[in-house]
Amino acid sequence: MLDTRSVIAIVDDDESICRAVKRLLRSAGMEADTFTSGQEFLDFIDAVPWVRVECIVLDMHMPGMNGLEIHERLLQMGNCPPVIFISAEDNPLASEEAFAAGAVDFLRKPVKDHVLIESLHRALKRVERSDVNS
């Protein structure tokens, strides 16, 4: 049996954002995997069951499947870790939609490094609390 590996998933169609966030998380001692589409991320979850996604940094607007659709699919699968939505869109409705869907945070791009790290720490504390309670 394989050991479980825990990661933070970064799902954004902009590869440069994926790389930058992954570097930031590594420098903060966190392990991250990147995905440039929602389908790529969902395929990964199906194919690699020994990886535990502890939190998702999820772009709200991507070609194909948008962030809200990905989040809904995860909820349907019963496998939805905390989600931090990110978006370049300057529309107050976007954050309302994200929180209504169950997001733990909504951050506007460009996201300041310390803001993302603080948001991730809060989300991961939620994961720890739910692990203790289950």
Question: What is the predicted role of each segment?
Answer:
Residues 15-33:
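Two-component/phosphorelay signaling modules centered on CheY-like receiver
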Residues 93, 111-121, 132:
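C-terminal output helix
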Residues 62:
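Receiver (REC) domain active-site loop signature in two-component systems and cognate sites
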Residues 43, 68-79:
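Short amphipathic alpha-helix used as the core "switch/output" element in two-component signaling
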Residues 58-59, 87:
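Active-site residues of response regulator receiver
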Residues 36-37, 66-70:
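Acidic catalytic/metal-coordinating carboxylates
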Residues 69, 90-105:
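Alpha4 helix (beta4-alpha4-beta5 surface) of REC/receiver domains from two-component response regulators
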Residues 34-55:
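Acidic, metal-coordinating helix/loop segments flanking the phosphotransfer/catalytic sites
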